[in-house]
From Swiss-Prot, chains A, B:
It is an enzyme of class 1 (oxidoreductase). Induction: Positively regulated by the zinc-responsive transcriptional regulator ZAP1. GO terms for molecular function: DNA binding; enoyl-[acyl-carrier-protein] reductase (NADPH) activity. This is Enoyl-[acyl-carrier-protein] reductase, mitochondrial. The gene is ETR1. Disulfide bonds: none annotated.
């Protein structure tokens, strides 16, 4: 059983909250960005009776959130005096899932109802908070159908994986058409394989060499719908490319799209496996190495290399995010996309008992902790 | 005075030739590709009275011609028995300028006249020859207005430089709009600067560091129309990029296009200087290093990286080559593009006195020789 939203619903729903608490920052620090965070209790300046008030259910701690604290992320919120600070400050966090606990009487509430679960339409709204206040329903997307973990991560990983598959290639689902991607164990890559499978597109996922390769590959293939998983050493092996790859791909295979979130040699090797005049999209650079492309791929094979940035794409075209979430939810309801909960380690913020000091420590642990993706889940 | 075509016109024009002589190859050899070349005398199989017969005036020895002999070039002519060889063979060379010496009576001659100077529309026709035979005027482009050196090189370097500037960006010639390119001393780069200048686009040309930097930069700026020349060390210098570059570019500058024929660090450094959502076209890889692109340029700056290949582009769309040559000739006639003769070392093939052995040595020298671009000029 997935945790239902009910479990997180407060008995005090439908009331205007009084105690606002947010994780805020005024400055940036590259080395140890947890230093710039503090917990701030404040009274919002808005007239809450005329606002959409949201109770936070969960927020993930994403790499981009951390990069924002470090001051190295190109997209950032405006810092304001809204939280009664001495210096202009912003609330950390860019995505999360919320429950509507109070609505205005006018048209600005749109079709929202009390108890609806929503996510912010845009990044930079600040999500590391117990409550948030919005003025218009058009800045929110309803996600009642999604479980907690899917809803809290759909804006970044969900949209990224979905749009990478859906928005660039005019696929023929009757053909033998493939995506090749590196970092095949990442959260986004798992969305990619599931969305691709649902659309009749095959995926070749490259993962790092490891002792339990077969076991990991089996999970990616059986649970997440990867068509075939290969290792980075196979990816980089010219003999493999010549002799084995064509058997994996089958007859009349077209490898039309490469998805790169690693860079360096891995990016060159997935690009080499593309058909002529194909596309590589880069959306991450885990290896810290630049994207590396043999000149001949550009000149003689017509390769196009572009970037994908979920924040900018959906800022430019908010409707595309609304449409993506709608399609994502349909696929989720059909069982084509499973919850990412197994990939996530939850950190519990009990809004009744967790002290400010404990909350700060909790979030710092989420920022610095290794292993699974971290998500703060609020208990009410 | 540029050498005129008159000088190369034969007294025997308007006659059907009897002695065909071509540099041909049947096999390939990477290490020393001159080994596969031989001089072949033959009688063409076509009915020459029903053909367009061309006398060769000059042909350059291009890197792509050499790569074809090596067997490492993705575009290659079909090998045939047309030249009375034991093994199927092809004539070397992909561009050159010819004079029409015999025409058929029918419509296949189009608007060609005896004495017209022409170039082949497509690559892979074989140009290292004293005569060539074509069946239709639609396979030829008239270039009567160009001097020998411009005409013999317009298919590769001329088209490349012209199309790189003209075919990808919708320029605003009233704006402060820039192209940045590396290998600023190359033949193509010199076409780029001249075409750009004629179109009201500014060029920032990067050249390798050298003792006589100022002298070389001055020639590129004064003679070839580069707006500003900088060194690779300046290109790679972050302080230069921050403090000096904006002064060079001026107010409201837009660096909209990067042209890369070097690769490696140089490609990363020119790409960094582009505005957001800009384009880098790679058309060569002199450093033998792959195209290297910081991940952030793709993701956060919206960089698109593509390739340019003159052969494929004009094969796909022959009309675009015809249009390019037409525009090139107009610009040449206005004096916006000068002859590349100063960049070229000529090797003379006297069709009356040069023996086959001497001819082969001449061409081998052209293939292996360092320094200036080599062109074989035929004397009749």
């Amino acid at each position: 059983m997935l945790p239902t939203f009910k479990r997180y619903m407060s008995s005090s729903a439908h009331q205007i909250p009084k105690h606002f608490k947010s994780l805020i920052y005024s400055t940036h620090e590259v080395e140890d960005c947890t230093k710039v965070l503090s917990v701030k209790n404040y009274t919002p300046k808005q007239d809450l009776s005329q606002s959409i008030v949201l109770k936070t259910l969960a927020f993930p701690i994403n790499p981009s959130d951390i990069n924002q604290l470090q001051g190295v992320y190109p997209s950032r919120p405006e810092k304001t005096y809204d939280y009664s600070t001495d210096e202009p400050a912003a609330i950390a966090g860019n995505e999360g899932v919320f429950e509507v606990v109070s609505l205005p009487s006018g048209s600005s509430k749109g079709d929202l109802k009390l108890g609806d679960r929503v996510i912010p339409l845009q990044a930079n709204q600040g999500t590391w908070s117990n409550y948030r206040v919005f003025s218009s329903s058009s800045d929110l997307i309803k996600v009642n159908d999604l479980d907690l973990f899917s809803a809290a991560t759909v804006s970044v990983n969900g949209c990224t994986g979905f749009q990478l598959v859906s928005d660039y290639i005019d696929w023929n689902s009757n053909g033998n058409e493939w995506i090749i991607q590196n970092a095949g164990t990442s959260s986004v890559s798992k969305i990619v394989t599931q969305v691709a499978k649902a659309k009749g597109i095959k995926t070749l996922s490259v993962i790092r060499d490891r002792d339990n390769f077969d076991e990991v590959a089996k999970v990616l293939e059986d649970k997440y719908g990867a068509t075939k998983v290969i290792s980075e050493s196979q990816n980089n092996d010219k003999t493999f490319a010549k002799e084995v790859l064509s058997k994996i791909l089958g007859e009349n295979a077209r490898v039309r799209l490469a998805l790169n979130s690693v860079g360096g040699k891995s990016s060159a090797s997935i690009a080499r496996k593309l058909e002529n005049n194909a596309l590589m999209l880069t959306y991450g650079g885990m290896s810290k190495q630049p994207v590396t492309l043999p000149t001949s791929l550009h000149i003689f094979k017509g390769l196009t290399s572009k970037g994908y940035w979920v924040t900018e794409k959906n800022k430019k075209n908010p409707q595309s995010k609304i449409d993506t979430i709608s399609d994502f939810i349909k696929m989720y309801n059909y069982g084509h996309i499973i919850s990412p909960r197994d990939e996530i380690e939850t950190l519990t913020w009990n809004t009744n008992t967790t002290t400010d000091e404990q909350l700060l420590e909790l979030v710092k642990k989420g920022i610095t902790g290794k292993g699974k993706k971290k998500m703060v889940v609020l208990e009410w």
